């Protein structure tokens, strides 16, 4: 399945919530009407079946983290095999992706931009270049911008944008050095309450 390259706000309208696909700090609902579906007439969303609600939640989370369908299913399988709460395990796997950590640290304005930075070999983990967006970051790993990439305007712009947002408590970033420490694996209480991972578990359990 190809990665979606169309309008970002259209996806957020489809899911009825901000998917954090844009780089600005302004609330997305000031730019578009989230209560109506995308399209010329923007028809109001119809009530979904139980399956439809579960499917929408899965699509929402998949799009937030920018993961393809096959990758997402594999993450779910890994989460189900891991001891503990399957839904929380799934979110942990998504949060520890390198592209997501780069975004959380503010080196990329969006997860999509952060994924590009990783793919273009602009990011290092513990002093070594890593160009795999799905690379799993572990607690106490140090993530940094490669020295020759530190002059990139988009990275500087992203840091300026991230300075207006509150940094997650599980990362510690030195903007001057363009370096951050992934202090710990985030707990469920650290993450968005607008995600209902149990719906995803119910969907895949059928």
Swiss-Prot record:
One biological process term in Gene Ontology: translation
Task of the protein: One of the primary rRNA binding proteins, it binds directly to 16S rRNA where it nucleates assembly of the body of the 30S subunit. With S5 and S12 plays an important role in translational accuracy.
GO molecular function, one term: rRNA binding
Gene3D superfamilies: Ribosomal Protein S4 Delta 41, Chain A, domain 1, RNA-binding S4 domain
Family: Belongs to the universal ribosomal protein uS4 family.
Keyword flag RNA-binding: yes
CDD domains according to UniProt: S4
Record's keyword terms, sorted: Ribonucleoprotein, Ribosomal protein, RNA-binding, rRNA-binding
GO cellular component terms listed in the entry, alphabetical order: small ribosomal subunit
Domain S4 RNA-binding: 96-156
Protein name from the UniProt record: Small ribosomal subunit protein uS4
Subunit field text: Part of the 30S ribosomal subunit. Contacts protein S5. The interaction surface between S4 and S5 is involved in control of translational fidelity.
Keyword field contains Nucleotide-binding: no
Origin species: Shewanella pealeana (strain ATCC 700345 / ANG-SQ1)
């Amino acid at each position: 399945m190809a990665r979606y390259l169309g309008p970002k706000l259209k996806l957020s309208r489809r899911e009825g919530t901000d998917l954090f696909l844009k780089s600005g700090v302004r609330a997305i609902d000031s730019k578009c009407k989230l209560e109506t579906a995308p399209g010329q007439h923007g028809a109001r969303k119809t009530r979904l079946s139980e399956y439809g609600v579960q499917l929408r939640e899965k699509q929402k989370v998949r799009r937030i983290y920018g993961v393809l369908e096959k990758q997402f299913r594999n993450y779910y399988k890994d989460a189900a095999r891991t001891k503990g709460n399957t839904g929380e395990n799934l979110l942990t796997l998504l949060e520890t992706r390198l592209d997501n950590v780069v975004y959380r640290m503010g080196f990329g304005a969006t997860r999509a931009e952060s994924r590009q930075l990783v793919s273009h070999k602009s990011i290092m983990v513990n002093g070594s270049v890593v160009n795999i967006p799905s690379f799993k970051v572990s607690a106490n790993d140090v993530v940094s911008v490669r020295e020759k990439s530190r002059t990139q305007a988009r990275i500087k712009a992203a840091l300026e944008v991230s300075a207006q947002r509150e940094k997650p408590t599980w990362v510690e970033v030195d903007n001057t050095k363009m370096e951050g420490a992934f202090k710990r694996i985030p707990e469920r209480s650290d993450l968005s309450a607008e995600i209902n991972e149990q719906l995803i578990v119910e969907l895949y359990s059928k």
